[in-house]
Amino acid sequence: MTIALGKYTKDEKDLFDIMDDWLRRDRFVFVGWSGLLLFPCAYFALGGWFTGTTFVTSWYTHGLASSYLEGCNFLTAAVSTPANSLAHSLLLLWGPEAQGDFTRWCQLGGLWTFVALHGAFALIGFMLRQFELARSVQLRPYNAIAFSGPIAVFVSVFLIYPLGQSGWFFAPSFGVAAIFRFILFFQGFHNWTLNPFHMMGVAGVLGAALLCAIHGATVENTLFEDGDGANTFRAFNPTQAEETYSMVTANRFWSQIFGVAFSNKRWLHFFMLFVPVTGLWMSALGVVGLALNLRAYDFVSQEIRAAEDPEFETFYTKNILLNEGIRAWMAAQDQPHENLIFPEEVLPRGNAL
């Protein structure tokens, strides 16, 4: 019995092969299959944001001016979240709320869901683009894995958190000052800075910045001289076989500074990947917890003692009072639809005031 082994080849290309050839062709800007998701979604997300910040008011959703047309600048303009009464509606243009009326759709906050959902899929498309290109040039996919950190933060903050609350209203609006408002809201209503997941996120992001600065400086300090251009970007050939900098010298330097140092480039660079990505993922997990209204650390014994002893105050009890102040002063401004009125006597006053 004879078995013939060989590679099967099709006589003519089908539609998939034709599309694959065109999408993955070597060109100045790579398209790829991931581009079918990335480019349209990124275009719509950015276009929706520019449209909203330029023309669309937030008067009907937040009682605010939020566009350049109304007098805002780059820092104060925003695409605002829909009203709380609309809960978690997708706010489709052709849905029951807007009924195909584009002006009404903008007034209701439809641009926010439009930007948020297209933005999320655009970020996912960008990660898939990194996977696709890495596979094409036979790289490992760690760039795409690293980009999962920002995606996790975006999805948790803009989508999962409001899904756990009463509506999209409690998500951040897309604007600089709007994000600042959201940060104050997170602190006042969730005591976010005392949340261990926030602490891990801060450690990851700031630790990554420190590692990046140290690594860049160390490489610059230990470059091998090679010709006249040793201190310029033309000093080395991108296809060179030899090292660009001296790992041995760098190891000796940091061993003297700290007593310990990385002795392996692979471990060093994996650590530089691990620190920020883990920090971002921990932050995202913390925000998912806040969506379920999980609490941060509570030091109840200090609160009880502060309530009983007029002379006792800690930075923790002071922060708790500040959070109460944020809630009392902010809720009425931030949620005008609730018609909240707080008498002067219920506003928090600490022992030190």
Curated annotation (Swiss-Prot):
The chain crosses the membrane at residues 41-61, 125-141, 153-166, 208-228, 279-295. It catalyses: 2 a plastoquinone + 4 hnu + 2 H2O = 2 a plastoquinol + O2. HAMAP family: PSII_PsbD_D2 (MF_01383). GO terms for molecular function: chlorophyll binding; electron transporter, transferring electrons within the cyclic electron transport pathway of photosynthesis activity; iron ion binding; oxygen evolving activity. Fe cation binds at H215, H269. This is Photosystem II D2 protein. It comes from Aethionema grandiflorum (Persian stone-cress). The modification N-acetylthreonine is found at T2. The lineage of its organism: Eukaryota, Viridiplantae, Streptophyta, Embryophyta, Tracheophyta. It holds the Pfam family Photo_RC. The keyword Phosphoprotein applies. PANTHER family: PHOTOSYSTEM II D2 PROTEIN (PTHR33149:SF57), PHOTOSYSTEM II PROTEIN D1 (PTHR33149). Disulfide bonds: none annotated. The keyword ATP-binding does not apply. PSII is composed of 1 copy each of membrane proteins PsbA, PsbB, PsbC, PsbD, PsbE, PsbF, PsbH, PsbI, PsbJ, PsbK, PsbL, PsbM, PsbT, PsbX, PsbY, PsbZ, Psb30/Ycf12, at least 3 peripheral proteins of the oxygen-evolving complex and a large number of cofactors. It forms dimeric complexes. A plastoquinone binds at H215, F262. Belongs to the reaction center PufL/M/PsbA/D family. Pheophytin a binds at Q130, N143. One of its GO terms (biological process) is photosynthetic electron transport in photosystem II. The D1/D2 heterodimer binds P680, chlorophylls that are the primary electron donor of PSII, and subsequent electron acceptors. It shares a non-heme iron and each subunit binds pheophytin, quinone, additional chlorophylls, carotenoids and lipids. There is also a Cl(-1) ion associated with D1 and D2, which is required for oxygen evolution. The PSII complex binds additional chlorophylls, carotenoids and specific lipids. 2 of the reaction center chlorophylls (ChlD1 and ChlD2) are entirely coordinated by water. It is found in: Plastid, Chloroplast thylakoid membrane. Chlorophyll a PD2 binds at H198.
